[in-house]
Amino acid sequence: MFEQNTDATQSVDFYAQMDGSYENSKLFNCDYKIVVNGPFVSPCEEFVTVKGQTTLDLKATPFARISASAQVAGKKVTVTYRVIPTSSNYDVSEVYGYWNFAPGVDNGSANQAGKQTVNEKEGTIVFDLENDKNYKDNLYKIQGNGNKIYVRIGAKTEGVINYSTIIETIV
């Protein structure tokens, strides 16, 4: 985010939440240019005039859209997914299934307790938690959080990862 029509040269950085929402409460009334870099077909750019409380919906096109649902049977979580590239020219090279005991779930090693990699754009990924060391090691955290775990699908498309929404499950 860059102030416009001022002498400011530094960007005002802000980050989106896992669900894509964002909030920046450290802005002055001013004109800004917003440039969002991410796993999008092209950078998302918008101009906005901030006057008091201002809302701006940024629109970006991901390389792939991912739908996912989860079913729990005992200590097995089955995630059914479908990856749809936004262009037939885009290569989906890998699909990842993740689970975590905290609501943050992505490809970062701190944001996953388990990960499986497949190559199919549509299918299922099964997490057998009963036989999962990370599940056993973190069972006290999971039980302290109402037996919730969180799952998500990621798809590596054109070298970047787009994600499904995070699904909360109870095991």
Where are these regions (language model features)?
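Solvent-exposed loop/turn segments flanking beta-strands in beta-repeat/beta-sandwich domains
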Residues: 1, 85-111
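Short, acidic Ser/Thr/Gly-rich low-complexity loop/linker segments typical of extracellular
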Residues: 4-19
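Short strand-edge motifs at loop-to-beta-strand transitions and within beta-strands
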Residues: 20-22, 54-56, 121-129, 138
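A short, solvent-exposed beta-strand micro-motif common in secreted/extracellular proteins
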Residues: 20-24, 28-41
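Structural beta-strand segments of beta-rich domains
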Residues: 75-79
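Proline-enriched interdomain boundary motifs that mark the N-terminal boundary
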Residues: 62-70
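Structured interaction patches on ligand/partner-binding surfaces of diverse proteins
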Residues: 38-63
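Beta-strand-rich modules
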Residues: 29, 39, 129-163, 171
